[in-house]
Curated annotation (Swiss-Prot):
Its EC number is 4.1.1.39. This is Ribulose bisphosphate carboxylase large chain. The keyword Disulfide bond applies. Heterohexadecamer of 8 large chains and 8 small chains; disulfide-linked. The disulfide link is formed within the large subunit homodimers. RuBisCO catalyzes two reactions: the carboxylation of D-ribulose 1,5-bisphosphate, the primary event in carbon dioxide fixation, as well as the oxidative fragmentation of the pentose substrate in the photorespiration process. Both reactions occur simultaneously and in competition at the same active site. The disulfide bond which can form in the large chain dimeric partners within the hexadecamer appears to be associated with oxidative stress and protein turnover. The active site is at K166 (proton acceptor), H285 (proton acceptor). The keyword Ion transport does not apply. Keywords: Calvin cycle, Carbon dioxide fixation, Chloroplast, Disulfide bond, Lyase, Magnesium, Metal-binding, Methylation, Monooxygenase, Oxidoreductase, Photorespiration, Photosynthesis, Plastid. InterPro entries: RuBisCO, RuBisCo_large_chain_AS, RuBisCO_lsu_C, RuBisCO_lsu_C_sf, RuBisCO_lsu_fd_N, RuBisCO_lsu_N_sf, RuBisCO_lsuI. It is an enzyme of class 4 (lyase). It comes from Cercidiphyllum japonicum (Katsura tree). Substrate binds at N114, T164, K168, R286, H318, S370.
Length: 466
């Protein structure tokens, strides 16, 4: 029929297309949808597709001026969720033309924009995204890559060790630098600014950068190893952030840091570009992620935030510990850890991976395990994360009864013992405690650490189960 037909029509007539063959260039999304009572799955799934792509709530005259078939999002498959009567997974395909090249901000504004406030839905969670190769290639991604980082640091065949300086707020710059020096001298590879250390009245950023650089060079001279401190460049404006990164580069330090969710993807991508151009490694902290990813039925799963970070750029990202004080179910965590590190990841629903993802030549990101871990966790961490990871012991280093440097020694000895045992073919999962006990016989620092944290366990059920 010719002409324009006004009025509201069912979304599913246009946007639910179960026979659609997805294209290699489509961005694919898996949403966990909880519709309001009485809204059928096809209609709810189609509603998600329309509201996150071309449509609005009614037909409009200007629809006739465009090719809807070319630009519309399509809900192409719906599957039930085991054990959840009210939820289902809706798969939506978006044509690549809907997205600006090289912009995570634009991708998210479309896919997880207004649609999350949609009345016909009780709750909505983005579980996974398949980023097509054609779109991946429009991003620079991480400034360096895992191999490049190892070459810069001259550290091979083991995880890297870090430590967040505590108390996180209140130290003067000089005392802060002293804590950095003690940890690095004792055997850590990195120390870290806490995510909320920016430039507060008690310690302005420039003073901190200076004293930390002094600590790094002093520790390097003493140990003969390359050291680093994640200088947090996060700031109130992008210009100020870049100014801090420039100062770090002038000091000659190896690495800076950014809070990518609070700082925002636009700022993060700018910083990642600066870091690649100037040879700085970039450590990424995920402060605020739990606001977005912790609820099972609403929000965005962390694996999507991790993919977005790999596109935006970062060399390290915090990704949970599986064993410490923060959320993380083992299989799910390993799923997004591999998404960060590997070039190609097969679809595997047992690990929460809904789509096969090919990253082509985008560099990988080192996962950082941090939060409530100590020397007794070392065998499990080495086993779970493997060599390509950063293990961060904040309280687990600084809380050592003989203070920071011995705390660092204990952590390094435990790590080297675990790596050696693994290389000799021992089973870390089964013999972990035994390996640590043996090592502590010839390291008084480790023995003292083992004594303090004998039986600490954080026993809660993880909320993020499949």
């Amino acid at each position: 029929s010719v002409g324009f037909k006004a009025g509201v029509k069912d979304y599913k007539l246009t946007y639910y297309t179960p026979d659609y063959e997805t294209k290699d260039t489509d961005i694919l999304a898996a949403f966990r949808v909880t519709p309001q009572p009485g809204v059928p799955p096809e209609e709810a799934g189609a509603a998600v597709a329309v509201e996150s792509s071309t449509g609005t709530w009614t037909t409009v005259w200007t629809d006739g001026l465009t090719s809807l078939d070319r630009y519309k999002g399509r809900c192409y498959h719906i599957e039930p969720v085991a054990g959840e009567e009210t939820q289902f997974i809706a798969y939506v395909a978006y044509p690549l033309d809907l997205f600006e090249e090289g912009s995570v901000x634009n991708m998210f504004t479309s896919i997880v924009g207004n649609v999350f406030g949609f009345k016909a839905l009780r709750a909505l969670r983005l579980e996974d995204l398949r980023i097509p190769v054609a779109y991946v290639k429009t991003f620079q991604g991480p400034p360096h890559a895992i191999q490049v980082e190892r070459d810069k640091l001259n550290k091979y065949g083991r995880p890297l060790l870090g430590c967040t300086i505590k108390p996180k707020l209140g130290l003067s710059a000089k005392n802060y630098g002293r804590a950095v020096y003690e940890c690095l001298r004792g055997g850590l590879d990195f120390t870290k600014d806490d995510e909320n250390v920016n430039s507060q009245p008690f310690m302005r950023w420039r003073d901190r950068f200076l004293f930390c650089a002094e600590a790094i060079y002093k520790a390097q001279a003493e140990t003969g190893e390359i050291k680093g401190h994640y200088l947090n460049a996060t700031a109130g404006t992008c210009e100020e952030m870049i100014k801090r990164a420039v100062f770090a580069r002038e000091l000659g330090v190896p690495i800076v840091m950014h809070d990518y969710l609070t700082g925002g993807f636009t700022a993060n991508t700018s910083l990642a570009h600066y870091c690649r151009d100037n040879g700085l490694l970039l450590h990424i902290h995920r402060a605020m992620h739990a606001v977005i990813d912790r609820q099972k039925n609403h929000g965005i799963h962390f694996r999507v935030l991790a993919k977005a970070l790999r596109m935006s750029g970062g060399d390290h990202i915090h990704s949970g510990t599986v064993v410490g004080k923060l959320e993380g179910e083992r299989e799910i965590t390993l799923g997004f850890v591999d998404l960060l590190r590997d070039d190609f990841i097969e679809k595997d629903r047992s690990r929460g991976i809904y789509f096969t993802q090919d990253w082509v030549s985008l560099p990988g990101v080192l996962p950082v395990a941090s939060g409530g871990i100590h020397v007794w966790h070392m065998p499990a961490l080495t086993e779970i994360f493997g060599d390509d990871s950063v293990l961060q012991f904040g309280g687990g280093t600084l809380g050592h009864p003989w203070x920071k440097a011995p705390g660092a020694v204990a952590x390094r000895v435990a790590l080297e013992a675990c790596v050696q045992a693994r290389n000799e073919g021992r089973d870390l999962a089964r013999e972990g405690n035994e390996i640590i006990r043996e090592a502590s016989k010839w390291s008084p620092e480790l023995a003292a650490a083992c004594e303090v944290w004998k039986e600490i366990k954080f026993e809660f059920e993880a909320m993020d189960t499949l």
